[in-house]
């Protein structure tokens, strides 16, 4: 299994996972957007954002250990697609960087042709990615509907 790398050092098809409070500020020249999945991160980001930077930010609150709605996942995917297709990367983060972030990463990997996206994300990013059975089922069902 892959070791946990929650500081934005890993890029999976243009998406960089991070966990609170890490943000890859050293890669600002590559970052086009930030997807925040937890209110604590949103509050912290609002404090940090006073730093002179402008990063388009999408806030989609997902309960800890939970899953997004299909509509919210579509919104996240569209946000990522837009920025990646324009040559920029997107940071995705919840708090621990495992379940909710892992779910988004696995779906993104699957949409990019990875055959076993959950295993791929666990190997490339973090062995704890996609924490719950509900999250695993959501990944597979979402990909069935969208591929």
UniProtKB/Swiss-Prot annotation:
It comes from the Archaea. Transmembrane segments: none annotated. InterPro entries: Prot-tyrosine_phosphatase-like (IPR029021), PTP (IPR050561), Tyr_Pase_dom (IPR000387). Keywords: Plasmid. GO terms for molecular function: protein tyrosine phosphatase activity. It holds the Pfam family Tc-R-P. The keyword NADP does not apply. GO terms for cellular component: cytoplasm. To M.jannaschii MJ0215. This is Uncharacterized protein MJECL20. It comes from Methanocaldococcus jannaschii (strain ATCC 43067 / DSM 2661 / JAL-1 / JCM 10045 / NBRC 100440).
């Amino acid at each position: 299994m892959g070791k946990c790398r929650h500081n934005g050092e890993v890029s999976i098809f243009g998406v960089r996972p991070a966990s609170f409070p890490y943000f890859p500020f050293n890669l600002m020249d590559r970052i086009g957007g930030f997807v925040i999945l937890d209110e604590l991160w949103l509050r912290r980001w609002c404090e940090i954002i006073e730093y002179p930077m402008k990063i388009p930010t999408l806030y989609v609150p997902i309960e800890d250990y939970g899953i997004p709605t299909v509509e919210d996942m579509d919104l996240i995917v569209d946000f990522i697609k837009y920025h990646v297709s324009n040559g920029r990367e997107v940071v995705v983060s919840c708090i621990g960087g495992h379940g909710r972030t892992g779910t988004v990463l696995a779906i993104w990997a699957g949409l990019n042709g990875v055959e076993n996206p959950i295993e791929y994300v666990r190997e490339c990013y973090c062995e704890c990615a996609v924490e719950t059975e509900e999250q695993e089922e959501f990944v597979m069902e979402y990909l069935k509907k969208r591929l």
